[in-house]
Amino acid sequence: MSGDKTIQFDPVENKKTLTKEILTKVYNSLLEKGYNPVNQLVGYLISGDPTYITNYNGARSLVIKLERDEILEEVIKSYLGIN
């Protein structure tokens, strides 16, 4: 890496990217185990019960790293096309 350029850290974009990466991994893990990923994620988001999420591929450990309200915030922003 060259010392000529300063890289800016954007915590908002970083959170958005991290949330998307984690949800994608969790979704794929649920799908691989034969679950309906959308139903399982909705169950988790509504109840807060992490047992809706499989332990397969560490999916449960990943999803609990995120606050449920922050997940919902990112999902709503994405749905409405708001950055």
From Swiss-Prot:
Pfam families attached to this UniProt entry: IreB
InterPro entries xref list: IreB
Origin: domain of life: Bacteria
Signal peptide: none
Entry's family note: Belongs to the UPF0297 family.
Name recorded for this polypeptide: UPF0297 protein CBO2563/CLC_2434
